Design a protein with these regions (language model features):
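A glycine-/polar-enriched beta->alpha junction
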Residues: 2-7, 14-29, 43, 64-82, ...
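Metallo-beta-lactamase
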Residues: 168, 217-218
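Transmembrane beta-barrel strands of outer-membrane/channel proteins
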Residues: 33-39, 246-252
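Flexible, solvent-exposed loop segments that connect beta-strands
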Residues: 45-53
Length: 290
């Protein structure tokens, strides 16, 4: 088991780390392969017509290795990577904040549990003392030392003290269930450690530097939000500039499988492309809008 909030925060970190890897992969060439085998029949009356005696049915085998690389000359991918990196760091700080909150809640809940334990001990001890006193009053009543009214008063106090015991027991069970929930476990008893008297708050030095505030997870998380926003703005402006790509293909083509890999069957292609907007009619500007 485990605390659900912590699990959600950890899953969010994994999500951004995966997105960071996907974004950064665009900085490198993309390499792939392909293979194809087919059987076809050509038209005998097509253009150009088949020569007399030629077989219209033929096989075609192809194998290729291709690569493409979109050059990030204007920083679109780098800015996107910066934005996702900031989101990764922010999500890590968010998880730290969740963990710190969980630890704080657990500590507070455990202290409350030990306080209830102490109250239950006091209630049981008080009940035992009242019962002893009631027994003494009963003996004295039989001896004619005290009145019936006094016996009834002490008996009422015994009943009141006893009535508090199940209330504390119910409160303890509810507090144990709360701690189990924070721990991500099924409801059940919580092992005890130090008593409430032994739980001392640590001494906090009076001269702590204010720079400690900069280490707070919520502060560090908030610092990354504008970093991610600025990087996203820069990435959104990249479509104003042209996209430049390089492509290459190396392969073989043959009508027979046995001739697929010898030198004469080899084929290759290399090229580049450039494309960019001229009249996007506000599409790019809309992406760039805050």
């Amino acid at each position: 088991g485990g605390n659900l909030d912590v699990q959600i925060a950890a899953a969010r970190i994994d999500q951004f780390i995966g997105a960071l890897g996907t974004t950064r992969s665009q900085l490198f060439p993309q390499i792939g392969y392909g293979a194809d085998a087919s059987r076809a029949q050509a038209s005998r009356i097509g253009q150009p017509p088949l020569p007399p005696g030629a077989d219209a049915t033929f096989s075609l085998f192809q194998a290729s290795l291709g690569a493409s690389w979109q050059l990030d000359l204007f920083g679109r991918v780098r800015r996107q990577s910066e934005a996702v990196q900031a989101q990764v760091f922010a999500s890590e700080q968010a998880q730290r904040g969740v963990v710190l909150t969980l630890v704080s809640n657990l500590a507070t809940s455990y202290i409350a549990l030990r306080a209830l334990d102490r109250q239950l001990e006091i209630a049981r001890a008080t009940t035992a003392n009242f019962e002893k006193t009631a027994h003494i009053f009963d003996l004295r009543y039989k001896q004619g030392v005290v009145s019936k009214v006094e016996v009834m008063q002490i008996t009422s106090q015994v009943q009141q003290a006893k009535a508090a015991i199940p209330l504390f027991e119910q409160a303890i069970a509810a507090q144990e269930n709360l701690i189990s929930l924070l721990l991500g476990r099924n409801p059940g008893p919580i092992p005890r450690g130090k008593t409430i008297d032994q739980l001392l708050a640590p001494a906090i030095p009076a001269d702590l530097p204010s720079t400690l505030l900069e280490r707070r997870p919520d502060v560090l998380q908030a610092e990354q939000n504008p970093v991610a926003a600025n990087a996203n703005v820069a990435a959104a402006r990249a479509p104003y500039y042209p996209n430049i790509s390089l492509t290459g293909l190396l392969g073989t083509v043959s009508t027979t499988f046995s001739d697929l890999f010898p030198g004469p069957s080899r084929a290759w292609r290399a090229g580049g492309s450039i494309a960019g907007p001229i009249f996007p009619f506000g599409a790019v500007r809309g992406q760039d809008a805050p």
